[in-house]
Design a protein with these regions (language model features):
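Solvent-exposed soluble domains appended to multi-pass membrane proteins
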Residues: 1-222
Length: 222
């Protein structure tokens, strides 16, 4: 069925918790708002524990430091054996591109993993805000149909540029897994999903530009 993410522009850790543990965070009331800190210590069942019980190595990869939102402790509580953050992978405090994350994952896993594995990888390049550094609009690949104004079109172009970068990073991991399958005969599953809706083009406040005028009437009823 469909995977429905939780919010506009926030709550990454909620989606992480729900996809790993399989529980709706809302059943825990206010504690469900900060799952890594408030709920993770009580987890004793998850997909990571399940995969370990069936002979899989489990690992998690962060594009940021492990202290961010208590991520390292939380993922240990969720059952992951190996947890590598940006500093563990030699990338400093923060990885700027998803390509960096994908390359670091391939390096850490190695060209020929000896056992089946389950890895949870976080990308962050396409997170808002989508301010861009372009000086003019001549290089924009796409524009809004209803306005030639620079600010919204610049953000749209930046959003799509980063999306293309993310697509390339995902493809590199797919190629990596396909190569392992060719050499070992072990098939793979690659699941890609977003953690929440982009805040940049919403009308939920927090941005100096209101994109509400570009939304369809049907969209406003959702």
């Amino acid at each position: 069925g469909l995977l429905r993410v939780n919010a506009m522009g926030g709550g990454t850790w909620i989606t992480e918790f729900e996809t790993i543990v399989g529980l709706d965070s809302r059943v825990f009331g206010y504690s469900g708002m900060y799952t890594h800190a408030s709920l993770s210590p009580f987890v004793d069942r998850s997909i990571a524990f399940y995969m370990r019980q069936h002979g899989y190595r489990t690992s998690a990869f962060f594009p940021h430091g492990g202290d961010f939102y208590n991520a390292r402790n939380a993922y240990a509580n969720y059952g992951f054996e190996t947890i590598l953050d940006s500093e563990d992978m030699g990338r400093g405090a923060w990885m700027e591109t998803d390509g960096e994350v994908a390359a670091s994952v391939r390096t850490a896993m190695g060209p020929a993993p000896q056992a089946p594995f389950f890895s949870y990888v976080l990308f962050i390049e396409n997170h808002s805000p989508h301010d861009c550094g372009a000086g003019d609009s001549t290089g924009f690949a796409v524009r809004f149909a209803d306005t030639q104004e620079f600010t919204p079109n610049c953000a749209l172009d930046e959003y799509l540029r980063r999306l293309d970068s993310t697509t390339s990073a995902v493809q590199s991991l797919q190629d990596y897994l396909a190569d392992i399958e060719t050499r070992t005969g072990r098939p793979f599953v690659l699941l890609v999903f977003g953690d929440h809706q982009p805040h940049t083009f919403a009308s939920t406040g927090g941005f100096h530009y209101d994109y509400g005028a570009f939304r369809k009437v049907a969209d406003t009823r959702m």
